[in-house]
Amino acid sequence: MPIIYMNITLAFIISLLGMLVYRSHLMSSLLCLEGMMLSLFMMSTLMALNMHFPLANIMPIALLVFAACEAAVGLALLVSISNMYGLDHIHNLNLLQC
């Protein structure tokens, strides 16, 4: 396995561990989720470049579109929760209390 693939896999694992450790605040969770999406984007781009198949280039673009949608929804949720409760704690997302 080349060193670049190991670095990208390590970045994904570190972001995943950050998601598990810093799950009390929504902003920290969103940043870790963006790190995971960035490492997946880099991995899919490298795989598409190495495959030399023209139709494989659409996968990184689709992943980038989904990451942008996820970021927009996450930030809208963060603004809504911080306006409603004044904090960005994850435990405020309990649907039974709304």
UniProtKB/Swiss-Prot annotation:
Record-level Gene Ontology MF annotations: NADH dehydrogenase (ubiquinone) activity
One GO CC term on file: respiratory chain complex I
InterPro entries assigned: NADH_UbQ_OxRdtase_chain4L/K (IPR001133), NUOK/Mnh_C1-like (IPR039428)
Cell compartment(s), UniProt: Mitochondrion inner membrane
GO biological process: ATP synthesis coupled electron transport
Catalytic activity annotation: a ubiquinone + NADH + 5 H(+)(in) = a ubiquinol + NAD(+) + 4 H(+)(out)
EC code(s) of this entry: 7.1.1.2
Membrane topology: Multi-pass membrane protein
Highest taxon above the source species: Eukaryota
Gene3D superfamilies given in the database record: 1.10.287.3510
Chain segments annotated as transmembrane: 1-21, 29-49, 61-81
Keywords associated with the record: Electron transport, Membrane, Mitochondrion, Mitochondrion inner membrane, NAD, Respiratory chain, Translocase, Transmembrane, Transmembrane helix, Transport, Ubiquinone
Its job: Core subunit of the mitochondrial membrane respiratory chain NADH dehydrogenase (Complex I) which catalyzes electron transfer from NADH through the respiratory chain, using ubiquinone as an electron acceptor. Part of the enzyme membrane arm which is embedded in the lipid bilayer and involved in proton translocation.
Subunit structure: Core subunit of respiratory chain NADH dehydrogenase (Complex I) which is composed of 45 different subunits.
Family the UniProt entry places it in: Belongs to the complex I subunit 4L family.
PANTHER family, per database record: NADH-UBIQUINONE OXIDOREDUCTASE CHAIN 4L (PTHR11434:SF0), NADH-UBIQUINONE OXIDOREDUCTASE SUBUNIT ND4L (PTHR11434)
UniProt protein name: NADH-ubiquinone oxidoreductase chain 4L
Organism: Piliocolobus badius
Gene: MT-ND4L
